[in-house]
Amino acid sequence: MTTKTGILLVNLGTPAAPTTAAVKAFLSQFLHDQRVVDLPRYLWCPLLHFIILPTRSPKVAKLYQQVWTEQGSPLMVISKQQRAALEQELKREGVEVPVELAMTYGSPSLDEGWQALKAKGVNRVILLPLYPQYSVSTTASVFDGWAKAMKKERNLPVVRLIRDYHAHPEYIQALAMSVRRHWEQHGQGEHLLMSFHGIPERYEREGDPYGHQCRRTAALLAEVLGLEASQWTASFQSRFGKEEWLKPYTDVTIAGLPATGIKRLDVICPAFAADCLETLEEIQVQNREIFMAAGGEQFEYIPALNSDQAHIRMMVSLICRELA
């Protein structure tokens, strides 16, 4: 049988609409995942259904309304652009393979992504989760979702999972180019904050390499940019619940920087392959307000790599390595 390879780009997902009902459905699926919240179900499920979802859904819906575009969710719009750009760039390289998009939560699901590839005759799949740094709560959830999608298959396709690319030279260079381009257009701030999505500290103690990989990414980026240790900080955002998460916390760090004399701050979020609620609202709105209220004078958010040419070229490099 002839082997036909297909690519499945995977990201976390997004609500279908910026409404309370749509956000509630999305959060329910997301927060039911035991890779994300591993508390005992008998404790977590009542808390989730009777307290968290009813109170959090309308609040989060209002946040989504601030960043929603005419085309839809920023994450979905950008992800579709990435898919199309990747397929086109592969074609330019002489690699004629179909590329489909899937989300761990929401639509298109991993099963829907697989069915689209299967309809094109694909029997070998390269899974590319758009998480540069591996974590049990992200990359491992993609693996789980893929396994679930395979449950009804009689003839399983060959699958290759690109586990992470946190130190890939082309990824680091793409980030560096993005930072330099921003500095050329807006001037260089006095400090560069690299904010990564956080995870509970307990996950790291139990073996999750995410924190180490984030710190490695940050150090490599700082090295390429030629920054001294005093010119940059790696921090962690988006903590949820009462557990201790990886530190330093982004909001606490940002609040304290003006008192150290840093009035002009640049922020980049290297763990996000596409701009989304956590970058466009949490960083660009909430954390900007925190910085300015603490005495800051200039806050510059450096956008995610999104469908930047260097980002797409990096994806091609990752995929071609698996095709070899």
From Swiss-Prot:
It comes from Aeromonas hydrophila subsp. hydrophila (strain ATCC 7966 / DSM 30187 / BCRC 13018 / CCUG 14551 / JCM 1027 / KCTC 2358 / NCIMB 9240 / NCTC 8049). Fe cation binds at residues 197, 278. The gene is hemH. One of its GO terms (biological process) is heme biosynthetic process. Pfam families: Ferrochelatase. Keywords: Cytoplasm, Heme biosynthesis, Iron, Lyase, Metal-binding, Porphyrin biosynthesis. GO terms for cellular component: cytoplasm. Belongs to the ferrochelatase family. Its EC number is 4.98.1.1. Pathway: Porphyrin-containing compound metabolism; protoheme biosynthesis; protoheme from protoporphyrin-IX: step 1/1. It catalyses: heme b + 2 H(+) = protoporphyrin IX + Fe(2+). One of its GO terms (molecular function) is metal ion binding. Catalyzes the ferrous insertion into protoporphyrin IX. This is Ferrochelatase.
